[in-house]
Amino acid sequence: MARIAGIDLPKEKRVEIGLTYIYGIGLTSSRKIIKATSVNPETRVKDLTEEEVNALRDYINKNFKIEGDLRREVALNIKRLVEIGCYRGIRHRRGLPVRGQKTKTNARTRKGPKKAVASKKKK
């Protein structure tokens, strides 16, 4: 069982895909890591040697901000935007889309479920 950055990588997957289970490492970063550590990308996680796992772990720790550190940094960035009261911070505070999307009809993901409005009765 390969354990990198506190994450158990899935045994049956290829190393290239297994590394993407770590928060902060996508497919492009995964391929870059594998190339730098000269590990065969077709190798399954269960077939990695201890030296290969250590090489991957060392390279990731030196060159990438992952898991808790990355989550903390993102949270602090959002908190900073909210505190300075800029447009993006206000959108975060109100729970609305931050990147300029229209909100008249869509944006349900950010706004949450629809809120019922009482209908007017006709006379």
From Swiss-Prot:
Pfam families to which the protein is assigned, alphabetical: Ribosomal_S13
UniProt keyword annotations, A-Z: Ribonucleoprotein, Ribosomal protein, RNA-binding, rRNA-binding, tRNA-binding
A Gene Ontology term for the protein's cellular component: small ribosomal subunit
Region (Disordered): 95-123
InterPro entries named among the record's database cross-references: Rbsml_uS13_C, Ribosomal_uS13, Ribosomal_uS13-like_H2TH, Ribosomal_uS13_bac-type, Ribosomal_uS13_CS
GO BP term, example: translation
Keyword tRNA-binding found: yes
Single Gene Ontology MF annotation: structural constituent of ribosome
Assembly and binders: Part of the 30S ribosomal subunit. Forms a loose heterodimer with protein S19. Forms two bridges to the 50S subunit in the 70S ribosome.
HAMAP family: Ribosomal_uS13
Stated family: Belongs to the universal ribosomal protein uS13 family.
Main function: Located at the top of the head of the 30S subunit, it contacts several helices of the 16S rRNA. In the 70S ribosome it contacts the 23S rRNA (bridge B1a) and protein L5 of the 50S subunit (bridge B1b), connecting the 2 subunits; these bridges are implicated in subunit movement. Contacts the tRNAs in the A and P-sites.
Protein name: Small ribosomal subunit protein uS13
Originating species: Clostridium acetobutylicum (strain ATCC 824 / DSM 792 / JCM 1419 / IAM 19013 / LMG 5710 / NBRC 13948 / NRRL B-527 / VKM B-1787 / 2291 / W)
